[in-house]
Design a protein with these regions (language model features):
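Conserved non-cysteine loop/helix-boundary elements of the Radical SAM core domain that shape
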Residues: 1-181
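A C-terminal junction/extension of Radical SAM enzymes
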Residues: 156-223
Length: 223
């Protein structure tokens, strides 16, 4: 129906974005059905950018990445959040940091040349030194896009009970974390190109997307 409305209105599709969740949580077969459906009903010939959030490494396989690649996807996200294994465990992630690196390298092997990686400043139990390590590890990997989020606790987050979070207790180093990320990314040729805020965000800060020159995430700009 959406495709038909777009055709009748004479609209041309410029960006495709699957995310705001984890599309790779479905099977490779389901993922292929999804991308085939998009290709069947929409004219992708004038699409400038096609993004899928691969997200968590525990949902990524070579088969799924190949399906995505074959569908013409030009940009993916592989999100470490942090490279500190202890912090990952505390916030409920079931993978080690190395798994992110492995998925990133696998994506490069398959030919992906536009990769975004998200990190979060202010995660519970994280420290300024640990966050600096995360930033430096990202710079070593060299993705085309890096998005620096500031922690915003959502209702569904597994930070209740023993992991209950007092937002006021997490604000200590978060501004320094964000400032460090900005300085180091810009020193290494990344440019800030979009930002947005969320509810319950620490220190009233924002989320900022950085990119290498000419690698802006177009969907992020348009919204």
């Amino acid at each position: 129906h959406t495709a038909e409305v777009a055709r009748q209105a004479g609209l041309r599709l410029r960006t495709v974005y699957f995310g705001g969740g984890t599309p790779t949580s479905i099977t490779a077969e389901q993922l292929k059905k999804l991308t085939d459906c998009v290709a069947e009903h929409f004219d992708l010939s004038e699409v400038w950018e096609y993004t899928i959030e691969a997200g968590r490494p525990d949902t990524i396989t070579r088969e799924k990445l190949q399906v995505i690649r074959d569908a013409g996807v030009t940009r993916i996200s592989i999100n470490p959040q942090t490279f500190n294994d202890d912090v990952l465990r505390f916030v409920g992630r079931k993978h080690p940091a190395q798994a992110v690196v492995d998925c990133y390298e696998m994506a490069r092997e398959l030919g992906f040349d536009n990769i975004n990686m998200d990190i979060i400043a202010g995660l519970p139990t994280d420290t300024l030194d640990s966050f600096r390590h995360t930033v430096e590890r990202l710079l070593e990997l060299g993705p085309e896009n890096i998005t620096v989020h500031t922690l915003s606790v959502k209702r569904s987050a597994d930070l209740s009970g023993e992991k209950a979070v007092d937002l006021s207790s997490l604000t200590g180093d978060v501004t320094e974390m964000v400032d460090y990320a900005q300085r180091r990314l810009m020193e290494n040729g990344y440019e800030p190109y979009y930002l947005y805020r969320q509810r319950n965000i620490l220190d009233n800060l924002e989320n900022t997307g950085y990119c290498k020159p000419g690698k802006e995430g177009l969907y992020n700009v348009y919204i």
